[in-house]
């Protein structure tokens, strides 16, 4: 029930994602078109300048070159806007992916705890059944063949149920949630895994890893001031 409710909430949270992505992609296409139009305008202005440069006065040359420079500046502005929009789009999708990764990790841990608890209860139940069965055997001695035959199906039924329970409990939670990983998704941290949950960046600009999961570096909250990863701290000590 809780899983179904979570799925419903998660689907609600990404309901507007396709529309937002479509809007951003449309804006990027428009910026592309504006850039191409500006580049065509620059080509025309450059051709005009080259063909008339000998007949233009100094003031006219400066004015013409300023038009070309202005067109170049506008073209760069469109390109910068497109890059910024692409980064926003990536962050928007990555936010949902990181949330899903974190929720899946919590769900897997919760599932493992529940199955461990079920395994403990099942072991106790089997011990109780075994003791009860031995007691029934002692009390049924001398009752005759008919009583013994009537007990046989019940014993088989208990055995079958126990085997079924064992087969369920033998399934590892990670097998249930085992999903293929995108080979193109970048990996981070000392664990070389994809980004998920809370992460912190190393303040060493030359750090080869850059980003780390809180749990992998024994953090629960973001520390104040600059923070350096264990590898960079160790390298710094070696240099001393």
UniProtKB/Swiss-Prot annotation:
Write down which residues bear the modification named Phosphoserine. 118
In its UniProt record, a GO molecular function of this protein is: zinc ion binding
Keywords per UniProt: Activator, Chromatin regulator, Chromosome, Metal-binding, Methylation, Nucleus, Phosphoprotein, Transcription, Transcription regulation, Zinc, Zinc-finger
Could you tell me the Gene Ontology terms of the biological process aspect for this record?
apoptotic signaling pathway; DNA replication-dependent chromatin disassembly; fibroblast proliferation; negative regulation of cell population proliferation; negative regulation of fibroblast proliferation; negative regulation of growth; positive regulation of apoptotic process; positive regulation of apoptotic signaling pathway
List Omega-N-methylarginine occurrences by residue. 126
Main localization of the protein described in the UniProt heading: nucleus
Please give the start and end residues of each transmembrane region. Answer: none
What role does this protein play? Component of the HBO1 complex, which specifically mediates acetylation of histone H3 at 'Lys-14' (H3K14ac) and, to a lower extent, acetylation of histone H4. Component of the MOZ/MORF complex which has a histone H3 acetyltransferase activity. Through chromatin acetylation it may regulate DNA replication and may function as a transcriptional coactivator. Inhibits cell growth, induces a delay in S-phase progression and enhances Fas-induced apoptosis in an INCA1-dependent manner.
Matching entries from PANTHER family are given as: INHIBITOR OF GROWTH PROTEIN, INHIBITOR OF GROWTH PROTEIN 5
Quote any Pfam family the record assigns. Answer: ING
What UniProt notes about the protein's domains is: The PHD-type zinc finger mediates the binding to H3K4me3.
Positions of the UniProt region annotated as Disordered: 115-165
**Highest taxon, organism lineage:** Eukaryota
List localization entries: Nucleus; Chromosome
Record-marked site positions (Histone H3K4me3 binding): 188, 199, 203, 211
An annotated GO cellular component of this protein is: nucleoplasm
Q: Where are the zinc fingers (PHD-type)?
A: 186-235
> What positions does the entry give for Zn(2+) 1 binding?
189, 191, 213, 216
Please state which protein family the record places this protein in. Answer: Belongs to the ING family.
Protein name per the record = Inhibitor of growth protein 5
Q: How does it assemble?
A: Component of the HBO1 complex composed of KAT7/HBO1, MEAF6, ING5, and one scaffold subunit: complexes containing BRPF scaffold (BRPF1, BRD1/BRPF2 or BRPF3) direct KAT7/HBO1 specificity towards H3K14ac, while complexes containing JADE scaffold (JADE1, JADE2 and JADE3) mediate acetylation of histone H4. Component of the MOZ/MORF complex composed at least of ING5, KAT6A, KAT6B, MEAF6 and one of BRPF1, BRD1/BRPF2 and BRPF3. Interacts with H3K4me3 and to a lesser extent with H3K4me2. Interacts with EP300 and p53/TP53. Interacts with INCA1.
Indicate which residues the UniProt annotation says bind Zn(2+) 2.
Answer: 202, 207, 229, 232
């Amino acid at each position: 029930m809780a899983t179904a409710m979570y799925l419903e909430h998660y689907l609600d949270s990404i309901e507007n994602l396709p529309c937002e992505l479509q809007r951003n992609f449309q804006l990027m296409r428009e910026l592309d078109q504006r850039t191409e139009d500006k580049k065509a305008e620059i080509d025309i202005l450059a051709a005009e300048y080259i063909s008339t440069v000998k007949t233009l006065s100094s003031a006219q040359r400066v004015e013409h070159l300023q038009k070309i420079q202005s067109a170049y500046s506008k073209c760069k502005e469109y390109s910068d806007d497109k890059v910024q929009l692409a980064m926003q789009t990536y962050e928007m999708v990555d936010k949902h992916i990181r949330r899903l990764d974190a929720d899946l990790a919590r769900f897997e841990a919760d599932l493992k705890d529940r199955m461990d608890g079920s395994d403990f209860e099942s072991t106790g139940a089997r011990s109780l059944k075994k003791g009860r069965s031995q007691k029934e055997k002692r009390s049924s001695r001398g009752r005759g063949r008919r009583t013994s035959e009537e007990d046989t199906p019940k014993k088989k039924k208990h055995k079958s149920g126990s085997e079924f329970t064992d087969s369920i409990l033998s399934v590892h939670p990670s097998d249930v949630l085992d999903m293929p990983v995108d080979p193109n998704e970048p990996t981070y941290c000392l664990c070389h895994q994809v980004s998920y949950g809370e992460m912190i960046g190393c303040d060493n600009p030359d750090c080869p890893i850059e980003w780390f999961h809180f749990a992998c570096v024994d953090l629960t909250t973001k520390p104040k001031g600059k923070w350096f990863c264990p590898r960079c701290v160790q390298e710094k000590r070696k240099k001393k």
